[in-house]
């Protein structure tokens, strides 16, 4: 482990340990990231000069107002497949004005299983000639390509990739849609999935999952429970989760298109939802013992926190230590922290991903 990686990781460990000490958690479990080639997605601006075109990012000056263009020829934190493709793709784009004209952004989405989706974003309308050139490029480089412009989306192949993880003595396939959220650090994601499954060990009754996304945690957790009800509001994520459940031949999961707030209303009988009836979901038929939450950075609203306090076990994955800290002030009134973890999902940044298991006092 290099000193620069160890130093930034230790700073996160110190911050989390100090911030959460008042909740007297057990010893912090630390899950490291690879030091390079850990990001499975990367987004670059395309910078055009009179005689050249290159990948670029912007660096803000100290005052935060001025931005400096930084040329990017390689990107060590991105997966090796992205780094290998970057110069090959750029050379092809430069050689074909149909593909390079008014191109302003290139996004890469890769998988450990070897798939690659490249999104080319333009400041012009894309025509049939562009589509023919993009098809030839996709075939030559063995990638999927998506072209985007205002009001346009042209798909060459698919608008998704399929990731595959080995976990719990089986493989799990995940559809990852181009515009939807996916965990960017696949190696750390696998460690998070394993930790969550370990936290669920010995659980009885059924599992409720809020904010399930594409079913990232839902699939492996389903092996630990008799029945699972997962909720998610974003339609594209719900469709991806349902595809993932079918592809993985798992038959004990139902997905409800509800926000956390809406689930609380339905669970407490305050409101009926046609969406539940149409999906043949009877919330009252579940006997929940454990709830799994992976909320957005804003954390969990007060009503949902009250709901969580009624569960025997809460497994909470957080991408924002500050909102986790605030939420734990409420949850530790009824529960104690029995597992505590740090996942270095975003090395060399201030972002910290953490996990806690809470059990009823």
From Swiss-Prot:
It is an enzyme of class 2 (transferase). It comes from Acinetobacter baumannii (strain ATCC 17978 / DSM 105126 / CIP 53.77 / LMG 1025 / NCDC KC755 / 5377). GO terms for cellular component: cytosol. Belongs to the class I-like SAM-binding methyltransferase superfamily. RNA M5U methyltransferase family. TrmA subfamily. GO terms for biological process: tRNA methylation. The active site is at 319 (nucleophile), 353 (proton acceptor). One of its GO terms (molecular function) is rRNA binding. It catalyses: uridine(54) in tRNA + S-adenosyl-L-methionine = 5-methyluridine(54) in tRNA + S-adenosyl-L-homocysteine + H(+); uridine(341) in tmRNA + S-adenosyl-L-methionine = 5-methyluridine(341) in tmRNA + S-adenosyl-L-homocysteine + H(+). Dual-specificity methyltransferase that catalyzes the formation of 5-methyluridine at position 54 (m5U54) in all tRNAs, and that of position 341 (m5U341) in tmRNA (transfer-mRNA). Its EC number is 2.1.1.-, 2.1.1.35. This is tRNA/tmRNA (uracil-C(5))-methyltransferase. HAMAP family: RNA_methyltr_TrmA. PROSITE patterns: SAM_MT_RNA_M5U, TRMA_1, TRMA_2. Pfam families: tRNA_U5-meth_tr. Keywords: Methyltransferase, S-adenosyl-L-methionine, Transferase, tRNA processing. InterPro entries: MeTrfase_TrmA_AS, MeTrfase_TrmA_CS, SAM-dependent_MTases_sf, TrmA_MeTrfase, U5_MeTrfase_fam.
